[in-house]
């Protein structure tokens, strides 16, 4: 249904800024992107799952806010995250 602990730790490992980093915007955006990708695949099979679609919209909105924050604070890190995740802007 969701990401398991192994998948989360792999994502955190790829995007963290320091050895103990789990909450930086880059890590949060990467985790949200993985959940969004998982839900997108879910909707290819379950087209009528409107309740989960609402959750997807909330995740996309949350990711957008984090991306906007990162863009305001450090454009270089923002560009790096977008390129690494393949998010269009």
Swiss-Prot record:
Q: Which UniProt keywords apply?
A: Ribonucleoprotein, Ribosomal protein, RNA-binding, rRNA-binding
Query: Please, which domain of life does this record's source organism belong to?
Result: Bacteria
An example GO CC term for this entry is: cytosolic small ribosomal subunit
**Keyword rRNA-binding (UniProt):** yes
**Region of interest (Disordered), residue spans:** 1-24
Entry's Gene Ontology BP terms = translation
HAMAP family from the UniProt entry: Ribosomal_uS15_B
Similarity-based family: Belongs to the universal ribosomal protein uS15 family.
| Functional note | One of the primary rRNA binding proteins, it binds directly to 16S rRNA where it helps nucleate assembly of the platform of the 30S subunit by binding and bridging several RNA helices of the 16S rRNA. Forms an intersubunit bridge (bridge B4) with the 23S rRNA of the 50S subunit in the ribosome.
Q: List the protein's name.
A: Small ribosomal subunit protein uS15
Q: Which organism is it from?
A: Halorhodospira halophila (strain DSM 244 / SL1)
């Amino acid at each position: 249904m969701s990401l398991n602990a192994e998948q989360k730790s792999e994502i955190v490992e790829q995007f963290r800024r320091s050895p103990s980093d789990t909450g930086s915007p880059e890590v949060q955006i990467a985790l949200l992107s993985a959940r969004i990708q998982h839900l997108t695949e879910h909707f290819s099979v379950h087209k009528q799952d409107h309740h989960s679609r609402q959750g997807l919209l909330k995740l996309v909105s949350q990711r957008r806010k984090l991306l906007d924050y990162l863009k305001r604070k450090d454009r270089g890190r923002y560009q790096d995250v977008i390129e690494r995740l393949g998010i269009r802007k």
